[in-house]
Amino acid sequence: MKRAAIAAAALALTGCSAADPEPTADGTVSQDTFLTTHGLAAMDAVEIIDHLDRQKVTERPTDLIASVRADELLLSSDDQEVVVDLPDNQTYVSIAPYLTSTHDCFYHSLTTCLGELDNEDIQVTITDEATGEVLVDEATTTFDNGFIGFWLPDDAT
């Protein structure tokens, strides 16, 4: 529930080849096979998210959808999908500052979401509403997709 609160708070700021692996009867493939096929071999969820979010828009994979959920990273391609667990006690909050428009966004897509302000210098302050603790206070630059992401404690509000 607290992850939802963090996501809701972030939304106030957002605008939001190898051969094909053999699927099983239910359309799934092994996680290792899937990750290898998409150039993500040996990466954990943090590394995959960081890699995909920082990719130049023109270099993004067109055959992969990567969706950050509350407790997991859902990766899908064609009729195959795998889930990679997020680290315990952390959640990923992706923010896209905007000038003219935004939209409701429940799950950040690392491969399809585009914000308005790509490669822009910004100042970000994230404060835990319950404790007043400043979790992030830094000057940073948005990624090529117009977003910037932060790993936060999942109990922060």
Language model segments and positions:
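Extracellular Ig-like/FN3 beta-sandwich strand-entry sites
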Residues: 119, 154-157
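Short loop/turn and low-complexity linker motifs enriched in small/turn-promoting residues
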Residues: 32-123, 127-130
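Glycine-centered loop-to-beta-strand initiation motif
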Residues: 142-150, 156
